[in-house]
Amino acid sequence: MMDFLSKTPEPPYYAVIFSSVKSENDTGYGETAERMVSLAADQPGFLGVESVREADGRGITVSYWDSMDAINHWRHHTEHQAAKEKGRSVWYESYAVRVAKVDRQRLFQENTND
């Protein structure tokens, strides 16, 4: 399960936290979400992403970036902007975006060499 956790560098770096509640109309959502992760991964400064979604539509995605410039570049990417507009008009009942600077981290992995 450790592969779920992004392999981030030593801080400092930045986290963009996207919390959302999906609407019932999610036609095309899965494909677009996968495309956005793939596209983000190709952007300068992208460090990783972790995402979960509950059956009731609640979800959270945390993406990690090396700078605010990288975040702003991604934020203004044309295809990302189109996906955000579709999210507001069709896919989400509500969402929140928060940006935080990561100043320290602690990682743990159970020893599985027994």
Curated annotation (Swiss-Prot):
PROSITE patterns: ABM (PS51725). Coiled coil: none annotated. SUPFAM superfamilies: Dimeric alpha+beta barrel. Residues 13-99 form the ABM domain. PANTHER family: ABM DOMAIN-CONTAINING PROTEIN, BLL5343 PROTEIN. This is Uncharacterized protein YqjZ. It comes from Bacillus subtilis (strain 168). The gene is yqjZ.
